[in-house]
């Protein structure tokens, strides 16, 4: 806890989110913008709000987020992971419900590297019989 803020770091793909929560009225600010202005897709907004709605804290906290790297989906996942960790920092009794929903575990899937001699990570050149 930093002052009256609770902190959590979230990661997803190449995105990293630093999340600070404190008691408030439900404002979420991402990189200085309201969440609805920062994330253009409705699914991204839904992903970010999942841990708050699960724990019935949607209108309980003001949240400030700094997120870098990755694209929109990766950043939304990183923010969700950070909010989850900050909620656990605030109240450890929330951990079992968040863990059962799968929000505590970091999604370790990363982009597979491109291999030499292939078009992409696994896509080979088209085979020609003749």
From Swiss-Prot:
Q: Does the keyword Ribosomal protein apply?
A: yes
Q: Keywords assigned by UniProt? A: Ribonucleoprotein, Ribosomal protein
Q: Decide whether keyword Ribosomal protein is in the record.
A: yes
Encoding gene (name): rpsI
Instruction: Give the CC-aspect GO terms.
Output: cytosolic small ribosomal subunit
Q: Which Pfam families match?
A: Ribosomal_S9
Source species:
Burkholderia thailandensis (strain ATCC 700388 / DSM 13276 / CCUG 48851 / CIP 106301 / E264)
Listed name of the protein? Small ribosomal subunit protein uS9
Question: In which domain of life is the source organism classified?
Answer: Bacteria
């Amino acid at each position: 806890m930093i002052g009256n803020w609770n902190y959590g770091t979230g990661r997803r793909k190449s995105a990293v989110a630093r999340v600070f929560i404190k008691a408030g009225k439900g404002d979420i600010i991402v990189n200085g913008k309201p969440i609805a202005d920062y994330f253009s897709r409705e699914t991204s907004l839904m992903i970010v709000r999942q841990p708050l709605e699960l724990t019935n804290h949607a209108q309980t906290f003001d949240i400030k987020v700094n997120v870098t790297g990755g694209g929109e989906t990766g950043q939304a996942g990183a923010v969700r992971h950070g909010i989850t960790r900050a909620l656990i920092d605030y109240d450890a009794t929330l951990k079992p419900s968040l863990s059962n929903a799968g929000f505590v575990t970091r999604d370790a899937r990363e982009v597979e590297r491109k291999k030499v001699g292939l078009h992409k990570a696994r896509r080979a050149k088209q085979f020609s019989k003749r």
